[in-house]
C-alpha cells in the first residue's frame, strides 16, 4: 500500500513565468505515477535560502543600511585610570599566598639544606684531605675553613631540642670554601737541560678578599707565572735579542783600548758576547756552545803548535815596521803611481770590453750571413723539387705578403705623410704671412718716424708753458 501511494506523495514546485516576480504556484502532481520526477525538497529550500539572502544583502547594501547612517561619537567618561580595562578571567578560585609565608618557606628550605648536609672527614689519610693539601708545608688550610665535629653535634642536638637558628657561639651555619693552590712549573736556565722539572704552588688570584686584591694577585700571576712581558720584549724572529747583543758588543768594544797590536781584549769581548748568545738561545744554545768549544780548542792547538822563536821574530818585525820613518814625498809619489796604474787598468778594461763587444757583433753578422746563404741555397733546392701546384701556392703566399706590405705603406702614407700640393699651399701661405708681417713692420716704423717730429714739438711747447708759469 505504501508503495502504491508513494508516487502521489511527491509534489512538484513550479515557478511562475512572470518576469521579475518570484512566487510559488499551486502544487501539481506528477504525470508519470511510480517515477520520482518531482523536485527535491532540499534543492527547493536551498534556493529559497539563497533568494532570501540576496534580498537581505540588497536591503543592507543601500542607503537604508544603519551602518552607513550618521553616528555621532559617544563620550565615554573615565573617572580613574584603567577604569575600562578588560577584566581577565582568573584561572582558579585559589588565592595567592601572602609574601611573609613565602619568605618563611624559603628560609625553612635553606635552613634544612644547610643543616642536614654531611660533614667531610678531616683525617689526614682520607682522599679529600690529600686533594685539598697537596703539600703539608705549603698548605694554608686553617681550622676555620671547616666545621668542627663538636660544633656540628651540638648543632644537631640544638636542632632536635631547641628552636632553629640558635646555637652556641662556636657553631657556624655555612662552610667557607677555599680555592686550592695551583701547581706551576719553575723556570730554568737555558743551559740546564738535564735537570729534573721542579714545581711550586701559588695561590689562585680568585682567592682575594676584595676586587683590588684579586686584581693585584692576577697581575702578579701574569708577571711570575705567565711571563707576558717576555713575550712582549722578545719576538719570534729574535731581532730584538740580536739588537741587544749587538748593542752590548759595541759598548764593550768602545771600552777597550785599541793601542795594543795584539787584539786579545777584542777576542775576549767577542767570546763573552758569544757566550751570552749561547745562554740566551733556548733552541740553538747547546749547538752554539759546542761550536764555541771546538773553535777555542782549535785556536789553543794552533797557538801551541807555533814555536816561541817565530812569535818573537814576527813581533820584532812588527815593531820595526812601526818605528820605521816614512817620508811624505815618497808616500805622495807612491800614491800618484798607484793612481796612474789604476787609471791605466780601467782604460785597458774599457778597451777590452769594447773590443769584446765588436767581436761579438762581427761573429753575429758572420753567423747571420752564413745562415742567409744556407737558407737561399736550401730555398733554391726546394723550389726545384716543388711541384707546379706547390709553386703556385708559394707565389700566392708571396703575393699576399706583398699585398699586406702595400696596405701597411698606404696606411702609413695616409696617417703620417702629407700631399705635395698641400705642403706647397702651406709654404706659400707662410711666405705670404711673412711678407704681410714685414709690410706691417715697415708701416709701423714709418708711422713712428712721422709721429716723432710732432711729438717733439708738443713736448717743447709743454716745457715753454711750464717755464712761463
UniProtKB/Swiss-Prot annotation:
Q: Where is region (Disordered) located?
A: 152-174
Bias kind Basic and acidic residues: ranges: 152-161
Q: Which residues form a coiled coil?
A: 346-375, 423-453
InterPro entries the record matches: TSNAXIP1_N
Entry keyword set: Coiled coil
* One family name in Pfam for this protein: TSNAXIP1_N
Q: What is this protein called?
A: Uncharacterized protein C6orf118
Identify the species of origin.
Homo sapiens
Name of the gene: C6orf118
Amino acid at each position: 500500500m505504501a508503495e502504491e501511494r508513494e508516487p502521489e506523495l511527491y509534489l512538484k514546485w513550479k515557478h511562475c513565468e512572470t518576469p521579475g516576480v518570484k512566487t510559488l504556484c499551486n502544487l501539481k502532481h506528477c504525470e508519470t505515477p511510480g517515477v520520482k520526477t518531482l523536485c527535491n525538497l532540499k534543492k527547493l529550500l536551498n534556493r529559497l535560502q539563497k533568494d532570501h539572502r540576496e534580498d537581505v544583502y540588497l536591503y543592507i547594501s543601500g542607503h537604508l543600511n544603519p551602518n552607513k547612517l550618521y553616528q555621532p561619537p559617544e563620550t565615554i567618561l573615565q573617572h580613574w585610570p584603567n577604569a575600562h580595562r578588560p577584566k581577565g578571567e582568573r584561572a582558579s578560585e585559589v588565592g595567592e599566598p601572602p609574601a611573609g609565608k613565602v619568605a618563611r618557606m624559603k628560609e625553612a628550605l635553606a635552613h634544612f639544606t644547610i643543616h642536614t648536609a654531611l660533614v667531610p672527614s678531616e683525617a689526614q689519610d682520607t682522599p679529600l684531605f690529600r686533594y685539598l693539601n697537596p703539600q703539608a708545608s705549603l698548605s694554608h688550610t686553617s681550622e676555620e675553613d671547616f666545621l668542627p665535629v663538636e660544633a656540628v653535634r651540638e648543632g644537631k642536638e640544638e636542632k632536635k631540642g631547641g628552636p632553629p637558628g640558635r646555637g652556641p657561639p662556636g657553631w657556624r651555619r655555612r662552610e667557607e670554601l677555599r680555592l686550592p693552590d695551583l701547581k706551576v712549573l719553575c723556570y730554568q736556565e737555558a743551559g740546564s737541560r738535564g735537570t729534573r722539572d721542579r714545581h711550586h704552588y701559588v695561590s689562585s688570584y680568585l682567592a682575594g678578599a676584595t676586587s683590588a686584591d684579586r686584581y693585584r694577585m692576577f697581575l702578579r700571576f701574569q708577571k711570575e707565572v705567565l711571563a707576558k712581558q717576555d713575550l712582549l720584549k722578545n719576538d719570534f724572529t729574535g731581532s730584538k735579542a740580536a739588537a741587544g747583543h749587538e748593542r752590548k758588543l759595541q759598548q764593550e768594544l768602545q771600552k777597550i783600548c785599541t793601542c795594543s797590536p795584539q787584539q786579545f781584549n777584542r777576542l775576549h769581548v767577542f767570546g763573552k758576547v758569544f757566550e751570552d748568545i749561547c745562554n740566551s738561545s733556548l733552541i740553538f744554545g747547546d749547538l752554539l756552545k759546542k761550536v764555541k768549544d771546538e773553535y777555542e780548542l782549535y785556536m789553543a792547538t794552533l797557538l801551541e803548535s807555533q814555536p816561541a822563536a817565530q812569535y818573537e821574530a814576527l813581533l820584532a818585525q812588527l815593531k820595526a815596521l812601526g818605528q820605521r820613518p816614512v817620508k811624505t814625498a815618497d808616500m805622495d809619489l807612491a800614491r800618484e803611481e798607484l793612481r796612474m796604474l789604476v787609471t791605466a787598468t780601467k782604460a785597458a778594461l774599457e778597451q777590452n770590453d769594447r773590443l769584446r763587444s765588436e767581436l761579438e757583433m762581427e761573429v753575429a753578422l758572420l753567423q747571420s750571413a752564413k745562415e742567409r746563404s744556407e737558407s737561399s741555397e736550401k730555398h733554391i733546392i726546394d723550389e726545384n723539387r716543388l711541384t707546379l701546384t706547390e709553386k703556385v701556392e708559394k707565389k700566392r703566399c708571396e703575393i699576399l705578403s706583398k699585398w699586406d706590405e702595400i696596405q701597411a705603406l698606404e696606411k702609413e702614407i695616409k696617417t703620417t705623410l702629407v700631399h705635395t700640393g698641400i705642403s706647397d699651399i702651406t709654404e706659400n701661405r707662410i711666405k705670404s704671412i711673412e711678407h704681410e708681417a714685414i709690410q706691417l713692420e715697415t708701416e709701423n716704423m714709418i708711422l713712428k718716424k712721422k709721429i716723432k717730429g710732432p711729438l717733439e714739438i708738443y713736448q717743447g711747447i709743454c716745457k715753454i708753458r711750464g717755464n712761463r708759469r
